């Protein structure tokens, strides 16, 4: 009788609480695995626990001083009588792993991100990033940009773009929450410094015919809510975290999607989510965004006048694009799953 085949993912967060970002990518990757392969997801959490996430067995290792010791102990036990493939998204977990990482997915280079904020430990991050690549058999990048900005200098890599689980989520039909007379602008972002939310607040201030709704949470949400309140703006709302069904409803009903960033956009998932719903997406001309956007006319400089003019010009021209076809041809679940299927077939031989 042959050994069990197991794929073990390393991530960051509890996927039942944090449902976007890296967790989405791991879910998409896992769907390409054959049915006979067992799936595990490991992360550092608030306590030691086990639970199921779809068909993936999740292992939370308590975030304490002994977490890396417990990680290696668990893996040694799990892989003792099985063929294990370790697919990591977490630099630190791979760095302290005694085994080699089979596949390492790069969302943003560790040194690149720390350099953008001039982090005081950026040289330590540089060392960690290089060490992880040396310990990885194959490196997967989610865009050409992430490859170019990484410290990886070998040839054993692959580029596979992201897709979105929203494709399989049913739209939740609810009462309309928009002012039907205004141009409806929607965005899904983590509320942090790099996403340039100030630009949307400026846009709301400049043009009262725009109604802007932002889905997402983050460390600066109360700061920006206070700013909106102090400026007495009633045409922009930070809605906080929304379930996927509601997000699909807002995408479906909006006129425009924006994806703004100062840096650190290794792919730009909300761009393809906008295209899934056949919406025009205006996004910052930074990072990986230019290689994902349908046409450069939708790229904006991080300037409120440029952003406003681009939107108004598009609405006047009413030029026709098949955004949905662009999504399904380049980023659809089936297209991306097929690429991961070929990757895992090669790795699991």
Language-model segments: residues:
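Conserved donor-binding/catalytic core segment of Leloir-type glycosyltransferases
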Residues: 8-9, 140, 177-195, 201-204, ...
